[in-house]
Amino acid sequence: MLLPKRVKYRRQHRPKTTGRSKGGNFVTFGEYGLQAITTSWITSRQIESARIAMTRYMKRGGKVWIKIFPHTPYTKKPLEVRMGAGKGAVEGWIAVVKPGRILFEVAGVSEEVAREALRLASHKLPVKTKFVKREELGGESNES
């Protein structure tokens, strides 16, 4: 599972979940990607579960890039504990995903295989997603 090697502070405030994603909105490494449409927290366990679902479907073919990382700790107090007495212990790690963010990228397989693998991965995640293809940036060509 994904988690940071070391952090400056053990516990953090809950992150903002408003607005659209500032970066990571385009397919850069692979040919196909899975893009978030809604906002949510994604835990390291959900990311790992989605990765396993994709790689099992694709068997030995293709390459998968995970474009999100769970940097933020989330805490939880034990059951039946009264309020106060400090912040709870770190329960796990989350990645805040906003609309437009590319979650996973795939290359080296056909579009049908990539579409199905990413569909299986999307069922493991708490966000609505869509399948996107890499867009070649159209610029001026130097051919004359």
Swiss-Prot record:
The keyword Hydrolase does not apply. Residues 1-19 have a biased composition (Basic residues). It comes from the Bacteria. GO terms for biological process: translation. The keyword Transmembrane does not apply. One of its GO terms (cellular component) is cytosolic large ribosomal subunit. InterPro entries: Ribosomal_uL16, Ribosomal_uL16_bact-type, Ribosomal_uL16_CS, Ribosomal_uL16_dom, Ribosomal_uL16_sf. Residues 1-23 are annotated as: Disordered. Keywords: Ribonucleoprotein, Ribosomal protein, RNA-binding, rRNA-binding, tRNA-binding. GO terms for molecular function: rRNA binding; structural constituent of ribosome; tRNA binding. Part of the 50S ribosomal subunit. Belongs to the universal ribosomal protein uL16 family. Binds 23S rRNA and is also seen to make contacts with the A and possibly P site tRNAs. This is Large ribosomal subunit protein uL16. It comes from Staphylococcus carnosus (strain TM300).
